[in-house]
């Protein structure tokens, strides 16, 4: 018999035929990826039939969408499946104990639905801060010696759009990824013998035609020095019915049809940000992937308002691992225009990582890193338990500055690197009021921004009056561990010897 705890590791979706928009939809239609794409939520009118929105909330979302569209951005697309992960009232979510639900909105809502927050603080992040163009040849983009990204799909190809995406969803034709660009990228990968790993990405690598996917994988398979093919996709998370045996068979066959010797190692990289996304449907999709011999790794983005919480991160990492997804990276949110309200101070991320170490299985604790603008690549932000330089200075005891010196993988030193966005006090206070009015209460919109004066000089960082308090008892409670002596989980059987002996003698294992 499955225990109650095991039954509860997967989040439940809402029943689609109990939602106004899909009352007459059949199971067959619902489980068809083509139907999901055709019926994606693209308007506020559709959204109102799925979640509760006040007239003001609906109006403000509509205003946001129109403004973004006028800037050339296609901002709203949610698959029906992913929409069922949103609670009916996203402004008053039910959450786990310790997650401070009164200060939160539904995490899938935050990730999927543009709000007035996306129009605030326009001068705090650059448009296209993570642009690939300056380091590209055709569809290939490189910033490391041995690996490369091959962009095979437009930004607008994704099944569902992520509000926090580092790449703006453009409506103009300049984002087209045509066959010539792909061929130029394939040529470069074959030309540069240092490259042994390629990231096939987009947009979403699994949202292109089967014909194009087969062609790309077969051509990559012909390159002798290429050893690893990584496929970047969020389809398992936002549209798991799109992960079919037919698709997986095509990937396995195509990647090695023309390879010689040892087969190319193919694996998937996906994007889970919250345990609410770890559902039975996702678990089934991951099992199909693993049954075809592929592994799945994950990159989570640390997002203020979504998963900026010790309990939330712990549940997200361990639940995804329990269904077969390896938590690979926890990434700092990019300082991109329109999404700076999602940024969490790096110090907070380091504190979470410090206190996850040892309390979760090592393989479930990802590497914390920031992707540096301008082709700097990833810089690790992991805290260390080995202190030789900062004697008696602990990361979780004093609020640090909001900037630091970072050193990239190739030895470049960036002085005063800032992870947070900037704002004047007037702009910040006006923005908070707009969002308080939109949400309907205070305290749920807490952007972390650097407040500057008229000369750009740092005054303070907002919403940083305290650091997470994570003593052992608190961590034990948040992680749901049974407590023994000293308010700690049992880590030595000898500490509970009498209880164990008594229980063993009553168990089926006792032979007398």
Residue ranges and their predicted role:
Residues 183, 188, 206-360:
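Conserved AdoMet/S-adenosylmethionine-binding subsite of the radical SAM
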Residues 113, 121-151, 163-263:
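Conserved Radical SAM active-site core
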Residues 153-161:
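Cysteine-centered iron-sulfur cluster-binding motifs in ferredoxin-type domains/subunits
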Residues 1-142:
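Flexible, acidic/Gly-rich N-terminal and inter-domain linker regions that tether
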Residues 66, 70, 74, 204-205, ...:
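Conserved aromatic-histidine-acidic binding/catalytic patches
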Residues 167, 285-288, 387:
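Short, solvent-exposed amphipathic alpha-helical segments in soluble enzyme
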Residues 353-499, 504-505, 509-511:
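C-terminal accessory regions of radical SAM enzymes
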Residues 82, 162, 328:
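Conserved, mostly hydrophobic/aromatic
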């Amino acid at each position: 018999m499955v225990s109650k705890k095991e039954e509860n590791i997967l989040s439940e979706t809402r029943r689609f035929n109990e939602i106004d928009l899909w009352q007459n939809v059949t199971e067959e239609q619902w489980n068809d990826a083509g139907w999901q794409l055709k019926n994606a939520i693209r308007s506020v009118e559709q959204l109102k039939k799925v979640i509760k929105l006040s007239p003001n909330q609906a109006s403000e979302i509509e205003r946001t969408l129109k403004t973004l569209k006028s800037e050339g951005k296609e901002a709203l697309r949610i698959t029906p499946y992913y929409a069922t992960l949103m609670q009916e009232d996203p402004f008053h979510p039910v959450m786990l104990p310790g997650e401070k639900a009164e200060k939160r909105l539904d995490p899938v809502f935050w990730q999927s639905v543009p709000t007035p927050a996306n129009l605030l603080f326009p001068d705090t992040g650059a448009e296209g801060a993570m642009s690939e163009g300056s380091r590209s040849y055709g569809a290939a983009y490189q910033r490391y010696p041995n690996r490369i990204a091959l962009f095979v799909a437009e930004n607008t190809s994704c099944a569902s759009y992520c509000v926090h995406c580092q790449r703006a969803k453009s409506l103009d034709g300049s984002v087209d990824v045509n066959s010539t660009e792909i061929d130029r990228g394939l040529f470069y990968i074959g030309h540069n013998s240092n490259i042994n790993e390629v990231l096939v990405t987009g947009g979403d690598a699994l949202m292109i035609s089967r014909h194009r996917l087969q062609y790309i994988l077969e051509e990559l398979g012909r390159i002798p020095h290429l050893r690893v093919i990584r496929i970047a996709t969020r389809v398992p998370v936002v549209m798991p019915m799109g992960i079919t045996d037919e698709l997986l068979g095509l990937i396995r066959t195509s990647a090695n049809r023309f390879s010689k010797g040892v087969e190319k190692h193919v694996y998937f990289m996906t994007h889970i940000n919250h345990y609410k996304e770890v559902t039975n449907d996702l678990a089934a999709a991951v099992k199909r992937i693993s049954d075809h011999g592929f592994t799945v790794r994950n990159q989570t983005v640390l997002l203020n308002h979504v998963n900026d919480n010790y309990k939330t991160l712990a549940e997200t990492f361990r639940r995804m691992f329990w269904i077969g997804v390896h938590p690979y990276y926890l990434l700092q949110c990019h300082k991109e225009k329109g999404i700076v309200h999602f940024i969490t101070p790096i110090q907070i991320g380091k504190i979470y990582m410090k206190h996850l170490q040892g309390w979760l299985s090592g393989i479930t604790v990802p590497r914390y890193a920031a992707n540096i603008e301008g082709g700097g690549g990833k810089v690790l932000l992991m805290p260390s338990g080995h202190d030789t330089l900062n004697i008696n200075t602990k990361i979780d005891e004093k609020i640090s500055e909001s900037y630091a010196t970072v050193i990239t993988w190739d030895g470049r030193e960036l002085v005063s690197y800032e992870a947070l966005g900037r704002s004047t006090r007037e702009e910040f206070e006006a923005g908070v009021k707009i969002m308080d009015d939109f949400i309907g209460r205070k305290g749920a919109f807490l952007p972390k921004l650097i407040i500057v004066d008229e000369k750009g000089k740092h005054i303070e960082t907002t919403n940083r009056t305290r650091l997470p308090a994570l003593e052992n008892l608190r961590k034990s409670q948040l992680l749901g561990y049974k407590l023994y002596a000293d308010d700690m989980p049992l880590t030595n059987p000898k500490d509970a010897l009498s209880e164990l002996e008594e229980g063993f003698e009553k168990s089926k294992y006792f032979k007398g």
